[in-house]
Amino acid sequence: MGLAKLLTRVKKNFGTTILPDGQINFNLWAPDAKEIALCIKKPNESFLELKMETEKDGWFSIKTDKAKIGSEYMFKIDNGLMIPDPASRQQAKDVHNASIVVDSNEFNWENDINWKGRPWHEAVLYEIHTGTFTKEGTFNSIKEKLDYFVSLGITAIELMPVADFPGKRNWGYDGVLLFAPDNTYGTPEELKDLIKTAHEKGLMVFLDVVYNHFGPEGNYLYVSAKSKFFESKHITPWGDAINFENRYVRDFFIQNVLFWLEEYHFDGLRLDAVHAIKDDSPVHILEEIVAKAREQIKDRNIHLVLENDDNISKFLKKENNNHDYYEAQWNDDFHHCVHSLITGEKTGYYQDYSEEITSKNPAYFLAKCLAEGFAYQGEPSAYRSNVPRGENSKNLTVSS
């Protein structure tokens, strides 16, 4: 299937949709289940159970006026375990508890609809962990620091992953509910208000997203969709790989990309460790993500950035090339060779920059990074048992 056909197909939306007549539509993709009940929480803490309609390809759905904006709900799998919505927009408590019906149109963006962003060459990024950047560890408390960023000459802040994770403390890389900001940090409205206020001060806001694995606790996709959502052909450092050869799995992540960019007005995304995204499809999921984002959002600047330790240059912008591309990627070579140069460390992946092992001084690799982008452009990597690593980066734009 070609990319053009992928972009025009009809697909199902994950999660809840508020219908014009006030009813709520609930969709759940649960190919491992035989029967699903929607469980709506009542004032007395009990649940009203409504059997969902079975549809093709493992989908279950129901339209009902028994739920409203703010209602808490869960899904009961085969008359047994109750799970949150994998596409929950907000959790009542933690990842094991009920999801909340959210009105995506409720927030007043005011003049932010006129925000066009900033070009990539103006990006001066400041990375933030929401939980540790301030004493309060919230979206609201970051908002109070925006003038500080402006005074430094910062033009963009990048939030480390905020997708809902178990407990109250996490770096963000164990998220399991990818559409729900962790409620330890604040509500969806408070995150949107942070972004709106940042834009008023001329600051872009980026989000770090993790599409290579789910955290080990609270990942209820293992209950409802394990046979289709994950696959054992490829193994990642964090367990079974995500099955990006499945059409609905691809849709889940593409919808998540557009969700953050469109509903939250983020200016860009940083895709974590894409070298651990395994996809043998004719069109790689990374290509489809960037093509769909460019097709869908044309009225403002959006920027998509990769972390890719494999040094694959084909996803990045080339000189005199107008195809869909990612603006840039984190240069792990630069970090590693500078670290080796300063500390002399030569264990793990630092051995690839060690003079003792490579017969080249770390400064050689640093100079190559500064001149050409990647230090490794197909040379054998000692850390990877002398398997070649990287692609030619000489024809990338300077800003990549």
Where are these regions (language model features)?
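The feature marks proteins involved in alpha-glucan
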Residues: 1-25, 44-127, 134-137
